[in-house]
């Protein structure tokens, strides 16, 4: 009986000795949640201040307004912000596009599409945003183009889905600039373009 106890004890000691380096390498013992590392010097996505003015400024260039609803506690928001939203502002396919961010937990005031000043959190609630990140594309009248992009379930296709949403927004901007006969009825001056 003592031979069994001795070999069981030796086996457990060996298992512990050899598995400790593997566990340390794999960080199995860590109590910390996995976080995406974001460069401290990362560019910032501008906060929305006046959605009506920002959407009209984008429309001056034939582009929609792209808004990311996020929160400070959302690690996936950092991924969407750094990999998609910030690069979007300099994407040559969308000259003049404007992308902004709203914090769903913030009481910071922002002007909505009707010109009324509301807290960012109230604006998020008005648009039914409860999960973040959530990206929405808007035309110059504040109408949402297509479906929102909620979360980031598949990074391989996220850019494709974002492009689809933006293209729907571009179509909305272009159709807002035409009468029912198809003739242009809105000039860039109608949006107070610079």
What are these regions (language model features)?
Residues 78-93:
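Typically the conserved alpha-helix immediately C-terminal to a functionally engaged Cys/Sec
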Residues 47-64:
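A short beta-strand-turn-helix
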Residues 66-68, 98-101, 137:
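Structural recognition of the beta-strand scaffold that forms the well-ordered cores
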Residues 93-117:
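Thiol-based oxidoreductase modules, predominantly thioredoxin-like and allied folds used
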Residues 1-44, 188-194:
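N-terminal targeting signals for export/organelle localization
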Residues 61-74:
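Short active-site neighborhood of thiol/selenol oxidoreductases, capturing the structured segment around
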Residues 72-76, 84, 104-109, 142-143, ...:
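Solvent-exposed loop/turn segments at secondary-structure junctions
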